[in-house]
From Swiss-Prot:
SMART domains noted in UniProt: Ribosomal_S15
UniProt-recorded name of the protein: Small ribosomal subunit protein uS15c
Source organism per UniProt: Cicer arietinum
UniProt keyword annotations, A-Z: Chloroplast, Plastid, Ribonucleoprotein, Ribosomal protein
Gene: rps15
GO MF annotations in UniProt: structural constituent of ribosome
């Protein structure tokens, strides 16, 4: 159910960018994983191992976003508008 929700966005990004190592592609993948895990926590609030994994993914995504913000602010703003996420925590 949730898995099918995120696949179209990934396939859309794959068509636009053929490079799975690009910062935008990695951020999209991390964002999809984060959304899946947050929906998982609604059913399993005491799954502490998954919470640890979520914190690691959040840190990696934050690092990639700060890198992208330093390198190319226009690409960063475009990505944030596509993902509908807030950028208040980016350093």
């Amino acid at each position: 159910m949730i898995k099918n929700l995120f696949i179209p966005f990934i396939s859309q990004k794959k068509k636009e960018e053929e490079n799975p190592g690009s910062v935008e592609f990695q951020v999209v993948n991390f964002t999809n994983k984060i959304r899946k895990l947050t929906s998982h926590f609604k059913l399993h609030p005491k799954d502490y191992l998954s919470q640890r994994g979520l914190r690691k993914i959040l840190g990696k995504r934050q690092g990639l976003l700060s890198y992208l913000l330093e390198r190319d602010k226009r690409r960063f703003e475009k990505l944030m508008s596509e993902l509908n996420t807030r950028d208040s925590q980016i350093r």
